[in-house]
Curated annotation (Swiss-Prot):
Pfam families: DUF123. This is DUF123 domain-containing protein HQ_2548A. It comes from Haloquadratum walsbyi (strain DSM 16790 / HBSQ001). Signal peptide: none annotated. Coiled coil: none annotated.
Length: 168
């Protein structure tokens, strides 16, 4: 399960290498890499109002339903303002005007959402909002912050690569 870094533009053009945009993607785990341009106050569902610092964010998720990693295309459409339903915690962040979805790191076929989270927790600052994205598991949070979106994307790719090596 080598990590695959995909741009939102490739998904929109249906040219991504695993078929997310074409609706033929397999199930797997993913990390949304988000840049927040400025400190931002926002209401996040039941969490209430939170102030998030500017920087690079990584949101860890998984998609094992009938549409597989096609869920990532929904996130892309929310980030672009094409789909305006806020269903998951991450929707509040990626739909904010100060946020931009810059890349998606995927691990097709791998159910490693919480393993990615655990590894990132040991490498990154504490999650900025406890419980964010982790209401269906025992993880502290599924959202992590770093100084830059490039750094966080590279960390996520490294984590997935290491998890792959340790499972072989």
């Amino acid at each position: 399960m080598n990590p695959i870094v995909i741009s939102p533009a490739a998904i929109a053009a249906e040219t991504d290498p695993i078929g997310i945009g074409a609706g033929t993607a397999p199930p797997g785990s993913y990390v949304l890499c988000v840049n927040l341009d400025a400190p931002t106050s926002m209401t996040i569902g039941a969490h209430g109002t939170a102030v998030l610092p500017a920087g690079g964010y990584a949101y860890v998720g998984s998609a094992f339903g009938s549409n597989g990693l096609g869920r990532v295309d929904r996130h892309r459409r929310v980030a672009m303002g094409i789909h305006d339903v806020t269903h998951w915690h991450i929707d509040y962040l990626i739909s904010h005007q100060n946020a931009s979805l810059t890349a998606i790191v995927v691990a097709p076929g791998a159910d490693i959402e919480c393993a990615i989270t655990s590894s990132l927790l040991s490498r990154m600052k504490e999650p900025p909002l406890e419980g964010f994205g982790s209401s269906d598991c025992t993880c502290t949070a599924h959202l992590f912050i770093s100084g830059s979106v490039t750094h966080i994307r590279n960390q996520c790719s490294t984590v997935i690569q290491e998890l792959s090596a340790s499972s072989n």
